[in-house]
Amino acid sequence: MARRAGVSQSTVSLVFSGKGVGRISARTEAAVRAAAAELGYRPNAAARALKTGAARTVALVVPDIMNPFFGGLLRGAQTAARAAGYAVALIDTDNDRDWGAASAEALRAGPADGLLLFEVDPPPRAAGSEPIVVIESESRGHPSVRLDAERGTEAAVRHLLELGHERIGHVASVYDRPTFRLRRRAVDRLVAGDVARVHSDFTLASALAAARELLSAHADLTALFCDDDIVAAGAYLAARELGLGIPGDLSIVGFDGLDIGRVLDPPVTTVAADAEELGRVAFELLMAQLAGRRPRSRVLPVELEVRGSTAAPR
């Protein structure tokens, strides 16, 4: 392989041990990997782990793989990991906090070199020096990365207020997580009076039922803020069941910027978040820890994308 790539055996070793970062050029690494592919070589991960004590694998723990947001998150983390010679193992907790905590504890003592925990608390016994990054949450002992959900929600609600809406309802997440508390706080701060609110999980059936309940009980609502674009899609279904046009009778704003929002009719105004960037940054923070550094936590910006689902009330 070294002969095929035109490099030394030690250079090949650096590439496949993951120790070549900063020591060999990207062109040289690409040549080595191309030679390996031509020769059909695949490194033995198990043998390497026994020899080095490192599995070159990180675990990403998420609450719901059925939500497309987490596909983007995985893609971002995986792309960054692959460039660094790591694999990403995905764990789905199915929104079970206890299972998430148990998974994190097991992975901490198991095959993963580091943990990326989405809305999962780090194991209580985990030292601050252990390679753990929390996503969309906060931990005193570990670096975190999250979206600026509060500012994004403020932008969405202000957009509705500027259009002239005064009666704004909130189809909120049923899950009591930091990001959803920030969204709820922003809505409560900006909307006058008591906010008409219902709760939904991130399925169309749940969102349809919740939005139907909200709109039936509060016929004076002219706009809805939804904690997710899937929830917004359920609100579309409820509005049409009740004979409400969008945006003529009801304006709707979602969150996350998922593809489903673009195919709704009309496309939903949404607070767009870059899930891939969130995953990439999370992995970079983890790599910094693995290199012995103490990276700072990050807050990533979001952006309101105004589409066809919002207009001035009649």
Predicted regions and their residues:
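N-terminal helix-turn-helix DNA-binding module of bacterial transcription factors
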Residues: 1-55, 314
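Short beta-strand segments enriched in small/hydrophobic residues
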Residues: 11-14, 50-64, 159, 167-173
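Short gly/ser/thr-rich secondary-structure transition/capping motifs
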Residues: 39-44, 98, 116-117, 236
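Hinge/beta->alpha junction and helix N-cap segments in small-molecule ligand-binding domains
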Residues: 45, 63-72, 91-99, 145-155, ...
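Alpha-helical recognition/docking segments in bacterial nutrient-uptake
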Residues: 57-158, 162, 214-216, 220
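Periplasmic-binding protein-like
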Residues: 104, 111-119, 167-172, 197-198, ...
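Flexible loop/turn connectors
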Residues: 217-314
